[in-house]
Amino acid sequence: MLFRSKVAVIGAGSWGLTFGKILADGGASVVMWARRPELAAEITESKRNSRYLSGINLPRTMTATTSLAEALDGAQQVYLSIPSQALRENLAAVKPLVDRTDAPIVSLMKGVEKSSGLRMSQVIEQVLLCDPARIAVASGPNLALEIAREQPTAAVISSLSPETAEAVARRSRNRYFRSFVNTDVIGTEFGGVLKNLIAVDRKSTRLNSSHTD
């Protein structure tokens, strides 16, 4: 029987689900943490998520739970896909469950914490009190639904530790998703922030243009 390493994805929104699919298609056994029981049940039983990824079939190696302890138990890598302004409070619940492990902690989030101005990797380091070499960030020109439909794309995995970055990149590679590594965590995170700002600006420009036609 093929052994699949377990990874946990904390947050079952569109990007968390999409990255969970990437990981499962790359050979991992993926356990999602979802806040709502009905969402966890749909992912586990129907292999669907009609709210965030309508029409997408999820891999059979993806399941979901509302229990953080169950999701994190035995996870060899932990991926965080939580709204950036809610990260700190959610990490407080995660901390006691990852304190005794050395599993890499991977941020899938873009943005900075408004109250402190800290980047997501800095919030993770501050709350979890973990070695920054254990933290990685993932970023790229990615749209969740396009990737969920398996349109070929790529991302960058950054960590102060090349070993951590490469371990995460290996886990997240599959036939339609390629991951490249670097150690420029700051540049990778701010690149993701700027990408979001440009996307919002372009959307606003299109809306204003349509109103003047």
Q: Regions from the language model: what does each represent?
A:
Residues 54-63, 101, 131-134, 175-177:
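A short helix-to-beta-strand connector/capping loop
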Residues 3-56, 64-66, 93:
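NAD(P)+-binding Rossmann beta1-loop-alpha1 motif at the extreme N-terminus of oxidoreductases
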Residues 1-2, 207-213:
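Single conserved hydrophobic/aromatic residue that forms the stacking wall/gate
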Residues 7, 29-30, 133-135, 179:
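Hydrophobic anchor at the start of a short beta-strand
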